[in-house]
Amino acid sequence: MQKSLITKWLCISCIMVIATIVIGGITRLTGSGLSIVEWRPVTGILPPFSFESWQSEFAKYKAFPEYNSVNYGITLSQFKFIYLLEFIHRLLGRITALIYIVPLIYFYFKDVIKNRDMLPYIIALLLFCIQGFIGWYMVKSGLLNSPYVSHFRLAFHLIIAVIIYHILFYQLIKNRCDILLILSQTDFKLPLIFSGIAITVVYVQIFLGALVAGLDAGLIYNSFPLMDDRFIPMEIKDNFFDLKNWYDPVFIQFIHRLVGYSVFLVVVVLIICLLKIEHPKLNKIAYFLMIVLFMQVSTGIITLLYSVPIIIASIHQLFAIILLSIIIWCYFLIKSS
């Protein structure tokens, strides 16, 4: 009964974290992230209701660079749209944190989760607590002289969310899944290595994806597989190792493509390793990986070719999390055996 309760709690928490990540991506893609220019952790749980309240929020927004440089002349109705998207993202983050923290306290004091098992839950708790500060730290970077948030802070904000999800999902499968029943002579060395490498490169790719979004790097070089008939674009060919390139959307898009190829190759090798073991569970994971990898690559290419359509770009981000989840599941099963 207690195990089932923890499973349901972790499952809901994981779904909420994914939803918050996806809504956060949509908020960025629609340029809504700077519409709320204050951070009120407690009083900010309610949106404006009256016409006067909306006018007040709109007036605050007009005092910052994004209105004057990007959205000058937008109507109150247009402002309400971007405001409510950012509001929903923040509210979802608060609700997700509460859904995680309140039951965790209950489980701890009821000794449902033993002290020896508490460390990952505490780490996730600390990350939840600082994630709001990181989000505001990111937003503040776009409220100064430039109407754009720091792409590094944006990527950091996303990666913290992914780490939270990783911890919760790992605890979920640890609590829910049975280990593999395989003869001891089965060699797990290669699939274990490649599942670990796959997790690493997917993390790197998610981070780079956030940099692409932060610099609007998906709006240039909308061709595939080459960039303006070249593998390495002219802008970065002669100064490839210059650190300033990390502020250049051309370079960021190129690196995102490059790591994308790496993700594809590593996951394909992992799939081959899993199929060679000939175990039903691992074969099922291999088939899932084939489908999700295909969807991830396809949505990424479509996102690029069509200059970042919001729905496809959001699906692309979602499949990155699904791909990571399946690889984590694979890693757990192999390691537990």
Swiss-Prot record:
It is a multi-pass membrane protein. Its EC number is 1.17.99.9. One of its GO terms (biological process) is heme A biosynthetic process. The chain crosses the membrane at residues 6-26, 87-107, 119-139, 154-174, 192-212, 258-278, 285-305, 308-328. Pathway: Porphyrin-containing compound metabolism; heme A biosynthesis; heme A from heme O: step 1/1. It is an enzyme of class 1 (oxidoreductase). Keywords: Cell membrane, Heme biosynthesis, Iron, Membrane, Metal-binding, Oxidoreductase, Transmembrane, Transmembrane helix. Its cofactor is heme b. PANTHER family: CYTOCHROME C OXIDASE ASSEMBLY PROTEIN COX15, CYTOCHROME C OXIDASE ASSEMBLY PROTEIN COX15 HOMOLOG. Interacts with CtaB. Catalyzes the conversion of heme O to heme A by two successive hydroxylations of the methyl group at C8. The first hydroxylation forms heme I, the second hydroxylation results in an unstable dihydroxymethyl group, which spontaneously dehydrates, resulting in the formyl group of heme A. Belongs to the COX15/CtaA family. Type 2 subfamily. This is Heme A synthase. It comes from Rickettsia africae (strain ESF-5). The lineage of its organism: Bacteria, Pseudomonadati, Pseudomonadota, Alphaproteobacteria, Rickettsiales. The gene is ctaA.
